[in-house]
Amino acid sequence: MAEWHKIIEDISKNNKFEDAAIVDYKTTKNVLAAIPNRTFAKINPLITNRNILKPLIGQKYCIVYTNSLMDENTYAMELLTGYAPVSPIVIARTHTALIFLMGKPTTSRRDVYRTCRDHATRVRATGN
């Protein structure tokens, strides 16, 4: 099993990011790790299943920017918050979990994408 809490701890130390969570989408469909008392800590199993159709994350509406979540080469979805100030969000898929990462409004979309994909790639390399 991947060390989910270490990934969240690493992300929370970086001042560029506002929120992060890791959600199991294969078996239990619950939050495995998250920054406490933030939006993504409120993700529930229904959100995990329907997120591709109507993006509502932690009770916040989002706009899909790109969706390659099911592509085995890309395995990521980029979104923007549907309210001001606009923040970039990336969801990356490992073999067993989804990694949710939201940048601050001043953080570039590419920084959020790169960080989320890097974590997912490392976890995928371990087989999780």
Swiss-Prot record:
Job of this protein: More likely to influence phosphoinositide metabolism than actin assembly.
Source superkingdom: Viruses
SUPFAM superfamilies: Profilin (actin-binding protein) (SSF55770)
SMART domains named among the record's database cross-references: PROF
Alphabetical keyword list: Actin-binding
Molecular functions (GO terms): actin binding
Family recorded in the similarity comment: Belongs to the profilin family.
Transmembrane segments: none
Database matches in Pfam families: Profilin
Entry keyword Aminoacyl-tRNA synthetase: no
UniProt name for this protein: Profilin
